[in-house]
From Swiss-Prot:
Annotated Pfam families: Anticodon_1 (PF08264), tRNA-synt_1 (PF00133), tRNA-synt_1_2 (PF13603), tRNA-synt_1g (PF09334)
Chain residues that bind ATP: 603
GO biological process, one term: leucyl-tRNA aminoacylation
Protein name: Leucine--tRNA ligase
EC code(s) of this entry: 6.1.1.4
Catalytic activity: tRNA(Leu) + L-leucine + ATP = L-leucyl-tRNA(Leu) + AMP + diphosphate
Motif ('HIGH' region): 35-45
Molecular function (Gene Ontology), one example: leucine-tRNA ligase activity
Subcellular location: Cytoplasm
Length: 831
């Protein structure tokens, strides 16, 4: 058994990281984002977990009762795809992966409280979210409607807009199609205002994430008002954030799927083709990127304030049906999208805000004074906005409106491996909730996976049930929850993973909110927003007392590695490649290999570093130390062989230093600078960890190591401070490299464990230097420096500075006219 295995066994036997739900100590809850059990952990994952582990171990040493749990986000498409490939049940693949990944996490020495482990595909977990869903349904926060959805034709499932990347499914890479399907939604929009208003209070979140959430919620204040269609009784209702520019309108733009098209528009082949083209654009981001285009419908609307003015109705590719009303009026002079379209299809550009630029060349989008606008002339844009809305209200055609970019959360997924939605469809009774006594609705074991559609739809018996209300034959809902459902509340379950109800309210009151949540910034507008929404609803259902789940958030950078391709354009693993000179070759067949970009580690591009191989070669501590030392945690880290080798060498030197230290005999020599550095390092390493400057903390500890190393190689050693400094160093390093530091701690003669030892303390008075250096200037130019004793008075400093030979040379016998002293920094002698 090696040192790392030895200490992992001791920690397990001691239940070192299991914590109570009550304590006289202050609590601290640190959590890394719930991982998907993909099968293997690579070194890219290790960085995230290592950051969390340093924080957990440090806060424990600071005297906190620290909750640091782990579990598995185990529903999802990869398990189902593996089941199709291997002709097995997703459960087998998932549980096998969990077992393997749990071993890997334990082998890295992470301080998880495994007694609180959760698994989201366990019926004992998801039965609670099924009940919670029914509570949402009862409150009309969950509903079903037909919706135009993003359909992945390869994975045969619906994708959220956020899961569509450049028009393709985020997992399969297939070109996404648009389809109308009945979908289940959660009314997250009911909470849009609170979600937005609370963002400024998330002061311990990165500004980038707060900004992304604010933009995603996308609050717009404007007006809804109606245009009457010329020669028709129908109207088109538009939403505008700039209704004050109504006199600059030159068209009304509608979404490609606006209902007025089916009702009134004669679909020419050109219109059909344009609609088809628009329907292939998926996600609002894709609409934003697309070149602005439009096609005339043949319809006109009448201007609300001048019946002599008519505006053409244009189908555009930048108006979305699910934002506002699916229709806008276009004012090309003061909106850049409208301007681009107007230029393209030759629409008039009419200026209605004073500008110092030519609106025919580009839209003027700033505020100003209204012109060419009848009763609005001379008003500021803000005054005009209020006035025009008043006029809409007087005419009974419009009102002030707030819109949000945020849409209700579509939670339906047409896949097997997910939590079943607990609803029954009855021809007589409609939608019927599954009774509490019949929860959980579990997935069948006898399923066939042929890669086409949802096996639940095709199961011979599972979906056939009797209606709980009328007892007639009925059908179960065969959609399953989006897997973000499970990860939107799991952090509350850790407070007591054995609770009979969804949460243990008392335990949640103690632990929540999470003090520090650690994960990737890619979750800013999905998981993090959904978790905030769930927490607010759970608060209203009396499951938790908080309304915000995460007090602090830290988003770590990615681990990067070079990519490699062989002569046939196939991706290669790094271990399959060898470098000779400046070229790369395939280890087995000798073929030429092309080195590509340095990118985020990913399975698809095979630029992964296998964790087990690295552990066998260097050990867990060396891996942890490298991923934390080479770059600030919030920045990307490039994996390098030299970096991990350097970390391993440092650990070896620690062991060698320990052997030297214990052989030293006490003496009375004193090195004040070493003593000061010990206290300085304690103070600043603690501050660095608190601020997530972990690489800086490591640099400081290396500096202390070097100082001790230098000291013990002197003829006259300060043994007392060398020994004390080394003991302190081992304590400081423990959160970073826990195995070897526990081992060294024991060899130094300690009978306690480091994992629950107190963090070293420092003496503030020891941080003061006995001397300091001042720059000496003559007439503002540096002429010398001098080391002064801290006890020197101002008069003494001035006198010494004047008499310095280099200063005397430039004074040329003159008396100083003035002496300016900046304490402990600069003295400037003016003559």
């Amino acid at each position: 058994m090696n040192i790392e295995q030895k200490w992992q066994q001791i920690w397990q036997e001691e239940k070192a990281f299991e914590v109570p739900n009550e304590s006289s100590k202050p609590k601290y809850y640190v959590l890394e984002m719930l991982p998907y059990p993909s099968g293997k952990i690579h070194v890219g994952h290790v960085r995230n977990y290592s950051i969390g582990d340093v924080v957990a171990r440090f806060m424990t040493m600071q005297g906190f009762n620290v909750l640091h749990p782990m579990g598995w986000d185990s529903f999802g498409l990869p398990a189902e795809n593996a089941a199709i490939k291997n002709n097995s049940h997703p459960k087998e693949w998932t549980y096998s992966n969990i077992e393997n990944m749990k071993k890997q996490l334990k082998s890295m020495g992470f301080s998880y409280d495994w007694s609180r482990e959760i698994n989201s595909c366990d019926p004992d977990y998801y039965k609670h979210e099924q009940k919670f869903f029914l509570e949402l349904y009862e409150r009309n926060l969950a509903y079903q409607k037909e919706s135009l959805v993003n359909w992945d034709p390869v994975d045969n499932t619906v994708l959220a807009n956020e899961q569509v990347v450049d028009g393709r499914g985020w997992r399969s890479g297939a070109i996404v199609e648009k389809r109308y399907l009945k979908q289940w939604f959660l009314k997250i929009t009911n909470y849009a205002e609170e979600l937005l208003n609370e963002i400024p209070n998330l002061t311990e979140w990165p500004e980038a994430v707060r900004s992304m959430q604010e933009k995603w919620i996308g609050k717009s204040v404007g007006a809804n008002f109606r245009f009457k269609i010329k020669d028709n009784e129908d109207v088109i209702e538009v939403f505008s954030t700039k209704p004050e520019t109504i006199f600059g309108a030159s068209f009304v733009g509608i979404a490609f799927n606006h209902p007025i098209i089916e009702k009134l528009v004669s679909k020419t082949p050109e219109i059909e083709n344009f609609i088809a083209k628009c329907s292939n654009i998926t996600g609002s981001a894709e609409f934003d990127k697309a070149e602005k285009e439009g096609i005339f419908t043949g319809l006109y609307v009448v201007h609300p304030f001048d019946s002599n003015i008519t505006l053409p109705v244009v189908i555009t590719n930048f108006v979305l049906m699910d934002y506002g009303t699916g229709a806008v009026f276009g004012c090309p002079a003061h909106d850049q999208r409208d301007h681009e379209l107007a230029v393209k299809i030759n629409l008039p550009i009419k200026q209605v805000i004073e500008a110092d630029t030519d609106v025919q060349k580009a839209a003027y989008t700033e505020d100003g004074i209204i012109i060419n606008s009848g009763f609005l002339n001379g008003l500021s844009t803000n005054e005009a906005k209020q006035r025009v809305i008043e006029e809409f209200e007087k005419l009974g055609i419009g009102k002030r409106t707030i819109n949000y970019r945020l849409k209700d959360w579509g939670i339906s997924r047409q896949r097997f491996w997910g939590c079943p939605i607990p609803i029954i469809h009855c021809d007589s009774c409609g939608l019927v909730p599954v009774p509490d006594s019949d929860l959980p609705v579990t997935l069948p074991d006898d399923v066939k996976f042929d890669g086409h559609g949802n096996p639940l739809d095709n199961h011979p018996t599972w979906k056939h049930v009797n209606c709980p209300k009328c007892s007639k034959p009925a059908i179960r809902e065969t959609d399953t929850f989006d897997t973000f459902f499970e990860s939107s509340w799991y952090f509350t379950r850790y407070c007591n993973s054995q609770a009979l109800e969804m949460t243990d309210k008392k335990a949640c009151d103690y632990w929540l909110p999470v003090d520090k949540y650690i994960g990737g910034i890619e979750h800013a507008v999905m998981h993090l927003l959904y978790a905030r929404f769930f927490t607010k609803v759970m608060n209203e259902q009396d499951y938790v007392s908080v309304r915000e789940p995460f007090k602090g958030l830290f988003t770590q950078g990615m681990v990067l590695h070079a990519t490699y391709k062989d002569e046939h354009n196939n991706w290669l693993y790094p271990e399959e490649v060898i470098k000779k000179g400046n070229e790369f070759f395939h280890k087995e067949n000798g073929g030429l290999v092309t080195q590509g970009r340095i990118e985020k580690m990913s399975k698809s591009k095979k630029n992964l570093i296998d964790l087990e191989t690295m552990q066998q070669q260097y050990g867990a501590d060396a891996i942890r130390f490298f991923v934390l030392s080479d770059s600030p945690p919030e920045k990307d880290l490039e994996w390098s062989a030299s970096g991990i080798e350097g970390s391993a060498r440092f650990i070896n030197k620690l062991e060698q230093m320990q052997e030297t230290i214990i052989k030293l005999s006490d003496n009375k020599n004193t090195n004040k600078e070493l003593k000061r550095l010990i206290h300085f390092t304690i103070k600043h390493v603690a501050e660095d960890i608190k601020h997530f400057a972990l690489n800086r903390a490591i640099a400081r500890m290396r500096e202390l190591f070097n100082a001790i190393s230098s000291e013990i190689n002197k003829e006259e050693i300060d043994v007392q401070n060398a020994k004390h400094g080394f003991n302190v160093l081992i304590q400081l390093l423990n959160p970073f490299i826990p195995h070897i530091t526990e081992e060294i701690w024991q060899k130094l003669g300690h009978k306690t464990f480091l994992y629950n030892a107190a963090f070293p303390t420092f003496d503030e008075s020891m941080l003061e230097l006995d001397t300091y250096v001042i720059a000496v200037q003559v007439n503002g130019k540096l002429r010398d420096t001098y080391e002064f004793n801290t006890s020197a008075s101002e008069d003494e400093i001035k006198q010494i500075a004047i008499n310095l030979p280099k200063v005397q040379k430039f004074l040329e016998g003159k008396e100083p006219k003035k002496i300016i002293l900046v304490p402990k920094k600069i003295i400037n002698i003016i003559c």
